[in-house]
């Protein structure tokens, strides 16, 4: 039996787009012959998974797992092509499997995490449901007190870390993060480039035109302060009690904000615009050249 080398597996993966375990299995069956392995994969359903990989997966779920002592949380996003599949039990079971393994191993590197059993499960799921499935990102959050929240549709998940307080408080603030979507934790965290961009927008507003420089400067200061208050978590009115700022709520528990993470399914992914008439025509072999 021919020895299967890492280079052979790498070549087959690059040429087919299939997972490591499936490529290795194909090479073993082909006794190390890459071309034979490719031919056999083309005959089997194995290559179907690779073909699906070219399609945009912009639906899916965001999930959270928090440790029993509320000091560590893992938050992840797993994508599918359609919302219908995202609500399928098989898809949800896979997403939870990935989350649990990531949590147990303490792993946030998706490529490393997906080596072995999880990649085999992903490929099997692609075969079963006929859609591209991707594990997009996994983030670990640590702190003295950590709380997580997942919106009822599993599309938005968030985690908050505090220096003090309890799990219920951290979870409530995570719920606020999910609902309000602050840009930063505190005003000082706002990136300089975003501040400059906002200043340019304010300067261009009609009521700034023709005013003395000192008046413009004063108006600018007030509007920037408002911008920072609206977009900084600690300055926002708490969603469950708008009379209290989130920062004051945290302080009342003797704590401070360490940080937060909010994941929304599909954010930053450019969805494909599908021309269904053209797709049907192409499938029927009637598409025009």
From Swiss-Prot:
Function: Associates with the EF-Tu.GDP complex and induces the exchange of GDP to GTP. It remains bound to the aminoacyl-tRNA.EF-Tu.GTP complex up to the GTP hydrolysis stage on the ribosome.
Superkingdom: Bacteria
Key words, A-Z: Cytoplasm, Elongation factor, Protein biosynthesis
Key word Endoplasmic reticulum present: no
Region (Involved in Mg(2+) ion dislocation from EF-Tu): 82-85
InterPro entries (alphabetical): EF-Ts_dimer_sf, Transl_elong_EFTs/EF1B, Transl_elong_EFTs/EF1B_dimer, Transl_elong_Ts_CS, UBA-like_sf
GO CC list: cytoplasm
GO molecular function terms attached to this record: translation elongation factor activity
Cellular location(s): Cytoplasm
Protein name from the UniProt record: Elongation factor Ts
ATP-binding is among the record's keywords: no
Annotated family: Belongs to the EF-Ts family.
Organism, scientific name: Marinobacter nauticus (strain ATCC 700491 / DSM 11845 / VT8)
């Amino acid at each position: 039996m021919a020895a299967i080398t890492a280079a052979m597996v790498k070549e087959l993966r690059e040429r087919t787009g299939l997972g490591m375990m499936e490529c290795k299995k194909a090479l073993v069956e082909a006794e190390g012959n890459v071309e034979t392995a490719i031919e056999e994969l083309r005959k089997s359903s194995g290559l179907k998974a690779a073909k699906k990989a070219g399609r945009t997966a912009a639906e899916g779920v965001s999930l959270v797992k928090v440790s029993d002592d509320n000091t560590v949380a893992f938050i992840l996003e797993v994508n599918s092509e359609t919302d219908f599949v995202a609500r399928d039990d098989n898809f949800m079971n896979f997403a939870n499997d990935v989350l649990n393994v990531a949590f147990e191993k303490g792993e946030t590197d998706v490529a490393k995490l997906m080596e072995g059993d999880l990649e085999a499960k992903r490929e099997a799921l692609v075969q079963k449901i006929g859609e591209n499935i991707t594990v997009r990102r996994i983030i670990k959050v640590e702190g003295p007190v950590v709380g997580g929240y997942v919106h009822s549709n599993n599309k938005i998940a968030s985690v908050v870390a505090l220096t003090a307080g309890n799990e219920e408080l951290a979870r409530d603030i995570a719920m606020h993060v999910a609902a309000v979507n602050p840009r930063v934790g505190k005003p000082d965290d706002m990136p300089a480039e975003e501040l400059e961009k906002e200043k340019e927008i304010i300067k261009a507003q009609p009521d700034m035109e023709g005013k003395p420089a000192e008046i413009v400067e004063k108006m600018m200061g007030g509007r920037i302060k408002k911008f920072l208050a609206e977009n900084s978590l600690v300055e926002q009115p708490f969603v469950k009690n708008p009379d209290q700022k989130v920062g004051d709520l945290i302080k009342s528990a003797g704590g401070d904000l360490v940080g937060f993470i909010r994941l929304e399914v599909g954010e930053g992914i450019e969805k494909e615009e599908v021309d269904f008439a053209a797709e049907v025509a192409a499938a029927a072999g009637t598409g025009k050249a």
